[in-house]
Regions:
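Short coil-to-beta-strand transition motifs
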Residues: 47-48, 134-144
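Short, charged beta-turn/beta-strand-edge "cap" motif at the junction between a beta-strand
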Residues: 120-125, 136-139
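Flexible glycine-/small-residue-rich
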Residues: 55, 135, 159-161
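Extended, hydrophilic extramembrane loops/domains of integral membrane proteins
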Residues: 146-162
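Protein maturation boundaries and topogenic segments
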Residues: 1-111, 119-122
């Protein structure tokens, strides 16, 4: 038995074969998928402890030459440029440039960013915070809270992609 364990250990850590490489990948995947990810979920209080941004809804740049419904052939990416095009919506909904400038992740997220999450506490969620929630699609949505209100003892949040 001891000899078998030694051979297995040697195969995983010292063998240079493709089979050793593949075995390491499979074991790493299984450990992350069934131990690390659930443990993180338990500690952070969420079923999605790690998510990747898969859409451009929180980016502050152009996509297909469009940003906030306006077409640009060139767009200098900066907070001021973003606000000059998209800020009108926020201002018409009671959010000033100064307020937005103090929001967490004021520059949004880029497609491909990886985010570590923890369970939100509804008692301290406010306009400007970023929420990740399950919509009608299988992928979770990442949007910014733009309005909070109570109705019939229920708290509601309006969210918007930047």
């Amino acid at each position: 038995m001891k000899e078998h364990l030694k051979k297995t250990w040697d195969f995983f850590w010292n063998d240079e074969s493709i089979w050793s490489w593949l075995a390491n990948i499979v074991v790493a995947f299984l450990v992350i998928r069934f131990l690390v990810y659930p443990f993180l979920g338990l500690i952070l209080g969420t079923s999605f402890p790690i998510v990747a941004v898969i859409s451009e809804s929180m980016e502050h740049g152009t996509h297909a030459d469009l940003i906030c419904g306006e077409k640009f052939t060139e767009f200098p990416e900066s907070f001021d440029s973003y606000w000059s095009v998209c800020g009108q919506w926020y201002e018409s909904n009671g959010i000033t440039k100064e307020q937005f400038n103090k929001f967490p992740f004021r520059d949004g997220f880029r497609k491909g960013d990886v985010i570590i999450l923890w369970r939100a506490n509804k008692n301290n969620l406010d306009v400007g915070d970023v929420l990740i929630f399950q919509g009608s699609k299988p992928q979770p949505l990442i949007h910014r809270v733009v309005k909070v209100w109570e109705e019939d003892s229920q708290t509601y949040y309006q969210t918007k992609g930047d």
